[in-house]
Structures are given as structure tokens and as C-alpha cells.
Amino acid sequence: MERLFYPKVVAVIGASPQEGKVGNTIMKNLRNFSGTVYAVNPKYREILGFPCYPSVLKIPENVDLAIIVVPAKLVPKAVEECGRKDVEGAVVISAGFKEAGIEGAKLERELVEVAERYGVKLVGPNCLGMINTEIAMNATFSRVAPEKGRIAFLSQSGAFILAVLEWSKRNGVGFSKVVSLGNKAMLDESDFLEYLAKDDSTDVILIYMEGVEDGRKFMRVAKSVARRKPVVVMKAGKSQSGAKAASSHTGSLAGSYEAYRAAFRQSGVIEASSVEELFDFALLLLKYRKAGNLAILTNSGGPGVMAADACDQFGVPLANFNFETIRKLKEFLPAESNFYNPVDILGDASAERFSRSLQILSEDENVDIVLTILTPTAQMDFLKAAESVVGKNAVCCFMGGESVDESERILRSSGIPNFFDPVRAVRAISVLGRYSKISAKERVKEDLDVSVEREKAEEIIEKLLESGGRVVGAEGLPVLEAYGIEVAPYGIARNVDEARDIAESIGYPVVLKVVSPDVVHKSDVGGVKLNVGENDLEKAFFEILSNVEGRMPKARIEGVLVQKMVDGGKELIVGMKRDPQFGPMIMFGMGGVYVEVLKDVSFRIAPITRREAHEMVREVKAYRILRGLRGEKPADIDAIADLLLRVSKLSLDHPEVLEMDLNPVKVFESGYAVVDFRMVLGEEV
């Protein structure tokens, strides 16, 4: 990777003297490169003052990096020649690969085979190129070269990079490295993250992501990197239409957005919901890393109140000043001022009043960072105010237009972010708390307190698969029991006499449910009877059979589940779905028939730790209900966490289990019981 970012000799294969051609723009962009540049084009001997050769093989010295801009069908041959020349890396700008359809995908596979054969590291294809500002290497066809900075930017979209580079020029944002990933035929986000973690010129890493192909690799790498440097991701393709567009854009597998969110959370990656957030977070994290208590200092009550409200919205704690701070403020501020947080120094405040107040707040041991909000009054000298902010732990919200331009330049040169909107400023500050609390810390491996019977579960699953079972219900409950998961007492009856024997064994009242691989929602077809007593059992048994046969005549009925009626408790859902990119994804939420409407659920990628299991429970809105409301007894949270851990382990041990729904699970003051269950079996995704 070092040669990709720090080449001494670069060859542009497909260089052109013709204005407007990509090969021409790249040659122009490399004029300031600190190394040597060669053009490759059989038609010319010189392009823009650079020596030109008919093939990379003819260049009279070793080449470290090739930039390839020839038509797609010629790219494999160009990479083969690079391999024969011992070129270590190639950036393939050319489009027309897997993003273009079946033939393009075939060509991309051929390209990768050639690169692997010769050990050439590929960036792209279908990308904008790469930038390393440290050595003035702009190997892209962007018209704008970014300023030097401490932000590295990885993006699947080249066009997005073009827009960002222009914006960054206007806003004084610099970059260390910029990489357009394109189709990621060989090198992907994870590979570049590993390199950038060790890059001394990079402090913050930003990623525009449409999808990853190896989600577990990304999690493993991101978790390691995020412990050292903030990683902020903007994920596109969240909706079905967005995912479809992402797929057609770079051939990405967008996967489940819930899986990505869970992966980011577990890896310590900060997710930005917009371009604005992406760079707001980056600018804050460049300057500060420590989360803490915020003081608000303003010359206008309204914006101060906006900021205080935003603190509540985004979870930013407001500082409680010590008595000495309040005493010092009262010594010189007008009596009408507000001496508490937010501090309002009034609309007639001068820069001197502002500066003195800021100094006092900065000296308070309870204050970690100050948000300074100033509006353009006749009394306020923004230049002096900006100078007093330099050197302080502060974020500015200098509200105005031309009157704040010069002061903004002073702030920018010191790396102090300035926002027009107080709410946006607080939202940006909130990232400091998020970064300090991320779950990127080393996770301790936790063993289950009770061992599981993996081989027993494996035998049951094999028998179910041999019998042709794909969607499995009650007959799969022994799999749960093998993993120590508590199931309400039950039995499966093939006739009414068996049903009666089971009911007498487990005790009345009971629940009867149809057992059929074709019936998913049993209550919708009359396949469930609740609170069945001894005298009602026979009638209920035959009513279930009649109801299902009448409403789903083609359904295969394999029996009737007879289960102990479980009263009381709160209904939960625990589930697992195997994501194509990330593997088993564990779900938790409030259960029952309304789960699809309420969608009060949380997700994690397996394996999960006990701490993460508890986090999943706390994240749902209904957590307060589980804690106990209005004198109700609290639910057994530890038992729920244990259940989640067991489902996580089951999903990892048995890749042929594609999906599981434990719904509902009844949880009590002590313990829980799985009441209904569905499992989908098949080949691993």
C-alpha cells in the first residue's frame, strides 16, 4: 500500500494531449507531483512536456504506480504489462466493468485474475483516482486539487469526491489522502482503513459507503482502527430504492441497513446521516476528542435557548458552574445578565465583555468545552472576539454574513469550527460524546455460564433437513432446548388422544396451535386456541384442523402443538437473520402480533457480548416497561441477555439456520419462556 500512496515514478497509461480527455486532465494534475511522471500512448513521444512511450514495458526505469485510462476491454492487457514490468499498484479509472452488466462483470473477473497472477494491487475500476497531498500527487481527473489537511476521505462515488473537493476549497477544509474506491474489484475500504490507521498525516477518516462485500472483515478492521482514529461513515442505500441505485452504480451489494447500523455501532464507527454531518463531525474530531460538559456563552437569549434545547435533543450535558465562576461573572456583568448556563451577556456586550466571560468559563473545572454564540450587534467586534477564542476549548456560532467573514478566517486558521446555526453546532459537538462511548474498546470474550449441546442440535437440524423441512415450527423447539433456551412445556400431537395425554402431563389450561410448514401466521387462519380446558380440548383440536383446511386447503398439517398456557409476563421477540455481508444478525424487541407495526427493535451482529446484549435491551423504547411501571415488578433483564447470547451462539454454530423468530417470548420477574418459534433452514447465505 505504501507504493500506492508514495510512488516515486508514475505512468499514465492512456495519457492524451487532447484537451478535455481524462488522460489529459490527469497529466495536468500531475505537473506538481514530487516524483517522476511518464505518459504511455503509442501515438506520441511527448505529452504536455512529459516523455511518452508506446508501452509501460518501454519506460527506461522502474514504475511504482500506473494510472490506467484506456477503454475497458484494453485494461487487462495494460495490467498484464504492468505485472511484467513489476509495477506494484494500478489505479483503473476506466469504466465498463461489473457496473455495466454481465459482460462487464466477466471482464472485471478477468482483470482481477491478471492482477493476482502478477501481484499488482488494483484500485477501482470505475473510479476517479487517488490523491496524496503530502507529495502533491493528484492522480485524478478532478479540476480542483485539495489543500493539505489531516482528513482522509474514501468514497465509492467519484462524482461525490469531485463535489467535495470544490466545496472544501471554498470552506478551507484540507485532506491528507483521497481515494475513489470505484468497484473495489481488489482493494476495498478495509484495506485502506488498515493503512490509514498507521498514516501519520491522517487524524480522521471519512467514508462514503454504498455497500461492503465482506462485512465481517470490515467490522474487524474498523474496530481496530477506531480505537486509534475516528472513523465516520455516511451510508447510502438505506432504502430499497437507494439500495437498488447503489447496486446499479458500482455493483454494490447494499445488504440490510439494520445490519450496517449494528456493525457500525459494534465497531466504533460513527455514522453521519448527511454530507453536512459527515464534515461537521470531522471538523470537531480534528480539534477535540474529549467529551464532557458544555457551557453556552451568548449575547442573544434566543439562540442560547435553541442551543440548550439542542443539548437535550442530542444528549450533550450542560455544565453546572462552581460558585467561584458565578461570583466572578456577577462581579462585572450587568445585573440583567443570566449568570447560569446558558450565560447571556446581553445584546450590548462588547468583545471585551465576551472575552472576559469566556476566560472565566474556560477556567471552571466543570466546563470541558464552550459554545460561543454571537449575533452581529453594533457593539460586538467579531475580529477581537475571534482572537479571544483562539487557544480555548471552544466551538463558535458567529451568526451573520459579511460581518463575520474575517473573524471566520481567524477561527478557521486555528482549526476552530464556526457554525451559523446553534442547533447544528450542538449536533456537531455531540459527536465527541459518541466517539468517547463507542464500543470499539477491546471486547472481553465471554463464555456462557451453562454449556450447550451443539452435537445434539446438529443431529436434530440434520433430520429436519433430511425430511425436507425448510420452514420449521414446533418440531424445531428441541434445537432451542439443546442450547439451554427455556421453552414453555409442550408436546406435538398427531391425534386427539395424544393431545389429551400431553395436556394431562403438562397440566391444564393449554394452548393448541397448528403445526404446518405452510402456515406462518397461525392466528390468521384460525390455527390457535388459547386457554383450553379439559372439557374443551377435543372440540378445540378439531376446530383448528377444520379452520386451517378451510382457509388453506393445500397446507400440510403435521399435527397440533399442545403447550402449557403461560399467563402474565411481558411479550418479547428475539430473532436472527443471516445477512449476506455481515452474517448472523440478532434482533430484540417487544413482541406479539404488533411487532411489525411498532418496529421497536434493536440489532447486533453475532457474536455478541453480555454487555452488548444488555445494550440491545436498553435501546428499545419499551425498556421502561421492562424496568417496571407504576408499581409493576421489573422483568428479568439478565435472563433476557442470557437468551440473546444463546441465540447468538446457536446462529454461529449452525450456518444452515438462516432465520429464527422466537415470538412471543414471555419474560417474568424471574426467568422467561419461549411460547412460539419459527426457523428457516437451508444452505448458508
From Swiss-Prot:
Alphabetized GO MF terms: acetate-CoA ligase (ADP-forming) activity; ATP binding; metal ion binding
Temperature dependence comment: Optimum temperature is 77 degrees Celsius.
Catalytic activity: acetate + ATP + CoA = acetyl-CoA + ADP + phosphate
Signal peptide as annotated in the record: none
SUPFAM superfamilies per record: Glutathione synthetase ATP-binding domain-like, NAD(P)-binding Rossmann-fold domains, Succinyl-CoA synthetase domains
Noted pH dependence of activity: Optimum pH is 7.0.
UniProt xrefs under Pfam families: ATP-grasp_5 (PF13549), CoA_binding_2 (PF13380), Succ_CoA_lig (PF13607)
InterPro entries for this protein: AcCoA-synth-alpha, Acyl-CoA_Synth/Transferase, ATP-grasp, ATP_grasp_subdomain_1, CoA-bd, NAD(P)-bd_dom_sf, Succ_CoA_lig_flav_dom, Succinyl-CoA_synth-like
Regulation of catalytic or functional activity: Activity requires divalent metal cations.
EC number: 6.2.1.13
Domain ATP-grasp: 477-513
Residues where ATP binds: A503, E504, S505, I506, G507, Y508, P509, V510, V511, L512, K513, V514
Keyword Endoplasmic reticulum: no
Keyword entries, A-Z: ATP-binding, Ligase, Nucleotide-binding
Family note: In the N-terminal section; belongs to the acetate CoA ligase alpha subunit family. In the C-terminal section; belongs to the acetate CoA ligase beta subunit family.
Binding partners and assembly: Homodimer.
Listed NCBIfam families: AcCoA-syn-alpha (TIGR02717)
Role played: Catalyzes the reversible formation of acetate and ATP from acetyl-CoA by using ADP and phosphate. Can use other substrates such as propionyl-CoA and butyryl-CoA, but not phenylacetyl-CoA. Seems to be involved primarily in the conversion of acetyl-CoA to acetate. Participates in the degradation of branched-chain amino acids via branched-chain-acyl-CoA esters.
Entry protein name: Acetate--CoA ligase [ADP-forming] I
